[in-house]
């Protein structure tokens, strides 16, 4: 709770779309609002220069309250220790694995989140798939149907140049069958007629069958095969036409996909990642795609975000000279207009609750 009579310094980070300002107006004049639309490189990434780390500390040091968007700006303990004025760190979503909650608690920094949908929203239960599921499906269709390539070709005076890859009857392999993996698999099975195979380190066939039933799907498909067939990791990579990653990033899962796995993929297969970049050994994936060993990849997440201007993902001419096709988006899986505005509304509510000495919503520890 704040006690100073002078304006409390509040920073809004990572406002890429420039939509935050109207939401925070109601906090004035009690709070002095500073909005940053850019994101500096992560403090805890080995590739981040010391000069950038120092710049980040100097940028954040004056603020008592900081509002962030998901994991765009990580807050490891080493950074938190250099921010003596920080009392409230507000994230969006209901968890943030880029926050060091242990260090924050030790330092007396309150951390809170914002729910994706309002609990009083009567339409919430009627909604279709979440934004990340929709984005994953869009990437799969985009890379399989060559949408970005064809759009550019037509705008530059060209016409038909490539053949699309149909999904019907093909095999979708999901690494992870949690909420997102299940949602994507269900759509591809029911709408596009794809066969589904799944793997995770703890997934059993019994559990996959229960997920199918709970999701309103039969345990067996029309051919008598399991709707969600659990296979080994090796079988998934070697037989799937689309391999899609749906895993939570942890010390255990970091780098879980590497050259040994990617080498098993069929030349006609696609690799999709809408989860987290560090789940994949990025250099191994780059090497496979540069050599054109698979048909292509569609990625929404990367090791280092935002991507540096000189990143090979940006600079290579993908889809030419034997290279695989690559479709990229800038970590947009959760970025929907309604969701973002709701997050800012709830962030402001939490700041007010903190200032008034009330319990904040969605404490992160």
Describe these PLM feature segments:
Residues 1-65, 69-70, 205, 213:
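N-terminal glycine-/charge-rich "phosphate-binding" loop or analogous flexible N-terminal tail
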Residues 268-365:
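Rossmann-like dinucleotide-binding domain for NAD(H)/NADP(H)
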């Amino acid at each position: 709770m704040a006690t100073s009579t002078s304006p409390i310094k509040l920073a809004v980070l990572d406002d890429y779309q420039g939509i935050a300002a109207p939401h925070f107006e109601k906090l004035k004049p009690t709070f002095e609002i500073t909005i940053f639309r850019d994101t500096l490189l992560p403090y805890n990434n080995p590739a981040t220069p010391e000069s950038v780390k120092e710049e980040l500390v100097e940028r954040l040091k004056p603020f008592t309250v900081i509002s962030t968007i998901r994991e765009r700006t990580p807050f490891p303990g080493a950074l938190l220790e250099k921010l003596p004025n920080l009392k409230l760190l507000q994230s969006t979503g209901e968890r943030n694995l880029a926050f060091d909650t242990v260090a924050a608690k030790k330092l007396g920094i309150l951390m809170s989140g914002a729910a994706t949908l309002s609990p009083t929203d009567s339409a919430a239960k009627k909604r279709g798939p979440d934004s990340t599921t929709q984005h994953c499906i869009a990437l799969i269709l985009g890379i399989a149907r060559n949408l970005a390539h064809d759009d550019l070709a037509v705008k530059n005076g060209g016409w038909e140049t490539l053949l699309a890859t149909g999904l019907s009857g093909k095999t979708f392999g999901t690494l992870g069958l949690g909420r997102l993996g299940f949602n994507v698999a269900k759509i591809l099975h029911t709408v596009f007629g794809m066969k589904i195979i799944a793997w995770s380190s703890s997934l059993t066939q019994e559990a996959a069958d229960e997920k199918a039933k709970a999701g309103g799907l039969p345990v067996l498909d029309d051919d008598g095969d399991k709707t969600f067939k659990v296979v080994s990791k090796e079988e998934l990579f070697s037989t799937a036409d689309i391999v899609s990653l749906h895993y939570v990033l942890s010390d255990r899962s970091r780098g879980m996909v590497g050259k040994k796995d990617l080498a098993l993929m069929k030349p006609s297969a696609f690799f999709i990642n809408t989860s987290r970049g560090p789940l994949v050994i990025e250099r191994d994936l780059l090497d496979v795609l540069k050599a054109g060993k698979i048909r292509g990849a569609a990625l929404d997440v990367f090791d280092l975000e935002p991507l540096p201007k000189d990143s090979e993902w940006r600079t290579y001419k993908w889809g030419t000279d034997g290279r695989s096709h690559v479709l990229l988006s800038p970590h947009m899986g959760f970025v929907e207009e309604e969701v973002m505005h709701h997050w800012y509304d709830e962030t402001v509510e939490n700041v007010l609750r903190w200032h008034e000495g009330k319990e904040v919503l969605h404490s992160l520890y």
